Amino acid sequence: MPKIKTSRSASKRFKRLSSNKYKFKHAYARHILTKKSTKHKRHLRIKSILSKKNNRKIMKYLPYI
């Protein structure tokens, strides 16, 4: 049986933690930031952890990571 391919786009967006959870960076923090409030931009800087439901989906995309 052939090896499962790792989704390269998912591997660049998500990092696995030691507890088999995945952390990710928020969207909308690259450009056009002048309209956004300081509070909003500060919350976008914080890395978040995926929910359990999405965690199972990402595990299929990242079998070896």
UniProtKB/Swiss-Prot annotation:
The keyword Ribonucleoprotein applies. Keywords: Ribonucleoprotein, Ribosomal protein. Transmembrane segments: none annotated. GO terms for molecular function: structural constituent of ribosome. One of its GO terms (cellular component) is cytosolic large ribosomal subunit. The keyword Ribosomal protein applies. It comes from the Bacteria. InterPro entries: Ribosomal_bL35, Ribosomal_bL35-like, Ribosomal_bL35_CS, Ribosomal_bL35_sf. GO terms for biological process: translation. Pfam families: Ribosomal_L35p. NCBIfam families: rpmI_bact. Belongs to the bacterial ribosomal protein bL35 family. PANTHER family: 54S RIBOSOMAL PROTEIN BL35M, LARGE RIBOSOMAL SUBUNIT PROTEIN BL35M. This is Large ribosomal subunit protein bL35. The lineage of its organism: Bacteria, Pseudomonadati, Pseudomonadota, Gammaproteobacteria, Enterobacterales. The gene is rpmI.
